[in-house]
Regions:
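Non-catalytic helical/linker scaffolds that mediate oligomerization, partner binding
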Residues: 1-478
Length: 478
């Protein structure tokens, strides 16, 4: 059983129902809707196809709505793409209605002329083109081309080292967020997060819509790296978005940031996703490079909850095979991890709350007793996430009465979910475990399972119960 989860970005290469179903069969745990592209109508069609494929295959598949964020972009070029060569001069203006040409182009960012200073760099299209600011004349930013290349309509701009004065949510993001909440998305990702406070506007809109969902902070700005501890505390999960991060800060720092962020998220029982260019060569090729295979494996060994595919599945020529390949790499990496048994407690990973201590006790009891499964009864998902944090080699099953919680746990390492009725007592939990695990052939009579839950149910952080049970036997206290 593969433990780390796979997130797949949907797009033109995976738009049909059959293609989406094939992704689920290949190992997709979460479908990502990149709201930087496509209309609400297009994404809504994908939404229904994902739900249908999940129902027909019996797999739990979460839906992640990824907000574009306040992405800074160039404007429109009247005559198409423009080639800039080293030493050329080029002007970017914040004036409205400017059509781009060989010498000048507009931008979506009204604050550009006030935020940059001479000597700073502006990177275009993920760093493919580099411009150095030479002068600022009112709304016009004059630059010299340091590294040339082709630029075209709406290419992204990065301003490394510049604290840009943009809001956490753009008007488009707010519209997209309301659409995602009303449509039924399971998780929201917020782009270009800088501080823990950036979640506040998202929560305000969620409260207005009457639906609170987990929010993922995308770590892709140097400010986010500086504030990583408060971001992990404030948000429900993090995504290490290595594309923009590798443009905004020196490339050699990105692997260190990735490892640090994974450790911090695990310590706080928050899911973490590693994203961008994981199997990038498979957009065109049927096999990944050895370096890409090592990249995926090392993210798994570091302890990531999930690995993400972007262009590989949205526009790639080998989308389905890419997911199969990623699943095989993950499973191979996990063989060595799981063979080492339950990781020992250290000062870094020891529990710091009652719920964490109870979850650790359940994991250790399962290890000592040779349990067939660890079982978490959960309404909010918190109990399952706390158990997952300890990376026990014993398979972890989460029983929940809430479909949304089931879908949200699709991001959490090692969790396999069952949807069942609300259990209002430990005896009801035991009965449900017996019924479902025997029904699906997952256990034999007499197998040991360790059950943990929270009381009162549905309250995050209330995990306080552990019970050892032998399947099909009456071992309740007399």
């Amino acid at each position: 059983m593969r433990r780390a989860k796979i997130v797949c970005t949907l797009g033109p290469a995976t738009d049909s129902y059959d293609q989406i179903k094939d992704l689920v069969d290949a190992g997709m745990d979460v479908a990502r809707f990149n709201l930087s592209h496509g209309s609400h109508a297009e994404h809504e069609e994908r939404y229904h196809r994902v739900r249908k494929a999940a129902d027909e295959t019996g797999h739990s598949v979460g839906i992640l709505a990824d907000l574009q964020g306040p992405k800074i972009r160039l404007g429109h070029f009247t005559e198409g793409p423009v080639l800039l060569e080293r030493g050329d001069t080029f002007t970017i203006t914040v004036e409205e209605g400017i059509e781009g040409d060989r010498n000048t182009c507009g931008t979506t960012y009204a604050g550009l002329a006030t935020d940059v200073t001479p000597g700073e760099h502006i990177l275009v299209d993920d760093g493919k083109v580099c411009l150095e600011v030479t002068d600022i004349d009112g709304p016009r930013v004059h630059t010299t081309v340091i590294e040339g290349g082709v630029i075209s309509d709406h290419k992204g701009l990065n301003l490394p080292g510049v604290a840009v004065s943009v809001p956490a949510l753009s008007k488009k993001d707010e519209d997209d967020l309301r659409w995602a909440l009303r449509t039924g998305a399971d998780v929201i990702a917020l782009s270009f997060v800088r501080t823990g406070r950036d979640i506040q506007d998202v929560h305000r809109i969620m409260d207005e819509e009457g639906r609170r969902l987990p929010v993922i902070a995308k770590i892709e700005k140097p400010q986010a790296v500086e504030n990583i501890e408060e971001i992990v505390a404030a948000f429900d999960a993090i995504m290490i978005a290595r594309g923009d991060l590798g443009v905004e800060m020196p490339l050699e720092h990105v692997p260190i940031v990735q490892k640090r962020a994974i450790k911090l998220a695990k310590r706080n029982a928050k899911p973490v996703i590693v994203a961008t260019q994981m199997l990038d060569s498979m957009i065109d090729n049927a096999r990944p490079t050895r370096a890409e295979a090592s990249d995926v494996a090392n993210a798994v060994i570091d302890g990531t909850d999930a690995v993400m595919l972007s262009g590989e599945t949205s526009v790639g020529k080998h989308a389905i095979e890419t997911v199969h390949t990623m699943a095989r790499i993950v499973e191979a990496a996990e063989e060595d991890i799981l063979a080492k048994g339950l990781p020992p407690l250290t000062e870094r990973n020891k529990p710091r709350t009652q719920s964490g201590a109870v979850a650790r006790a359940a994991a250790e009891m399962g290890d000592f007793l040779g349990a067939r499964f660890l079982v978490a009864f959960t309404q909010s998902g918190d109990t399952a996430r706390r158990l997952s944090r300890y990376r026990s080699p014993i398979p972890l099953l989460a029983f929940t009465p809430d479909q949304a919680t089931r879908s949200q746990l699709s991001l959490t390492w090692g969790v396999e979910t069952f949807l069942g009725p609300y259990a209002d007592s430990t005896d009801a939990m035991v009965d449900q475990v017996d019924e479902l695990l025997l029904k699906y052939g997952r256990c034999r009579k007499g197998d040991t399972v360790v059950i943990t839950a929270g009381s009162p149910p549905g309250v995050s952080g209330s995990t306080n119960l552990v019970r050892v049970h032998h399947i099909g036997e009456d071992d309740s206290p007399k």
